[in-house]
Amino acid sequence: MNEIDIIQQIKSGEVSKMQFKERLLDSYDIGCELVAFSNARGGTLVVGVKDKTGSVNPLSYLEVQETTNTLSNIASENVVPAILVDVETISVDGGSLVVAHIKEGVNKPYHDNRGI
């Protein structure tokens, strides 16, 4: 995926297979998103985009590193059974977006670490 592709998808807005987060503030909430994607047909989580407005708020280099690590931790610790998340970084004006691709799970049903 490149900058042009992701910008076009952002302009189309959130849909069931694509969700936006400005930042990863709530590990439980993100875990629930990953569970939903895994139980459905997969999906994409884009970090660095305001979910209400679709406006891009790029991440700094340090934020990209933290976000990537956080996503990996959530996928392995907050989702049962654990899932793999394919993460890529897309450069945009002023920084980067983290794009996490979650495949449809093969070990359904998935749930969060609280059993929900």
Regions found by a protein language model. Name each.
Residues 1-116:
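Conserved N-terminal catalytic/coupling substructures associated with nucleotide/phosphate chemistry
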